[in-house]
């Protein structure tokens, strides 16, 4: 009986939409990389981030459908700026999702290959829900502890030195340090793309921690493993400051 209840619990989580989620998109003008990081209480968040190196990146959460991510990239590819792309995705979105919610429960951010960004937070998203644009980044969250979760991501990204992946990691850790997801942690992911990369869609990094109650710890461990296997990353001066103390960094500015 106990085993059955545990199975039903996790089965319920598997069909739960990405409510109670925070994410950030960032741009490195030095390298041209565009990346995203996300953490949620659901078992997997691999459907949140969508990116192409020569186009941009989308983070769709709240009541996500893969179509929202693909649509965002399609509109960027067609020449729309992020703000117009956000409007087009919202106006063309399905009213009902597979989980019975409306597009007004959706939250998504779009960043183009130049680092310009825009976002939409639906009026029916669970509090706290909101987004904030920073320097070369945009952060968003729904059903998180407070607005400090979102602003903390922006602050950590802006003040952490080093490669884009470490700045994104620092932002996720800062979000958790400021209260994070109100329903806990179970998954995290990071995706980085770059125009000119030989990999499909320009992907240079694609890592995830699923079904893990300490997903950010696992994600940072994966980054460390990547760094050890990459001569360029290991020899970089910026490797000395990789935001490893970000998990203890709370929002300092008003």
At which residue positions do the language-model features occur?
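Bacterial N-terminal signal peptides
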Residues: 6-17
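Positively charged n-region of N-terminal signal peptides that target proteins for export
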Residues: 1-4
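N-terminal nucleophile
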Residues: 18-254
């Amino acid at each position: 009986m106990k085993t059955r209840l545990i199975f039903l619990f996790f089965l319920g989580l598997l069909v739960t939409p990405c409510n109670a989620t925070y994410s950030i998109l960032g741009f490195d003008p030095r390298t041209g990389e565009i990346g995203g990081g996300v953490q949620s209480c659901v078992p997997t968040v691999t459907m949140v981030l969508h990116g192409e190196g020569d186009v941009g990146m989308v983070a769709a959460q709240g009541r996500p459908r893969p179509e929202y991510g693909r649509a965002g990239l399609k509109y960027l590819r067609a020449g729309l700026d992020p703000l117009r792309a956000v409007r087009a995705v919202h106006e063309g979105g399905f009213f009902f999702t597979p989980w019975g919610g409306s597009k007004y429960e959706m939250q998504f951010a779009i960043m183009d290959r130049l680092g310009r960004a825009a976002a939409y937070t639906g009026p029916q998203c669970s509090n706290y829900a909101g987004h904030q644009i920073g320097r070369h980044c945009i952060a968003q969250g729904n059903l998180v502890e407070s607005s400090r979760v979102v602003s903390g991501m922006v602050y950590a990204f802006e003040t952490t030195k080093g490669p884009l992946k470490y700045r994104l990691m620092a932002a996720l850790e800062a979000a958790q340090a400021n209260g994070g997801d109100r329903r806990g942690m179970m998954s995290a992911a990071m995706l980085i793309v770059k125009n000119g990369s030989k990999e499909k869609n320009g992907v240079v990094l694609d890592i995830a921690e699923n079904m893990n109650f300490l997903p950010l710890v696992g994600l940072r461990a994966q980054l460390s493993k990547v760094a050890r296997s990459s001569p360029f990353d290991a020899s970089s001066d910026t490797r000395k400051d990789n935001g490893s103390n970000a998990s203890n960094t709370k929002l300092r500015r008003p």
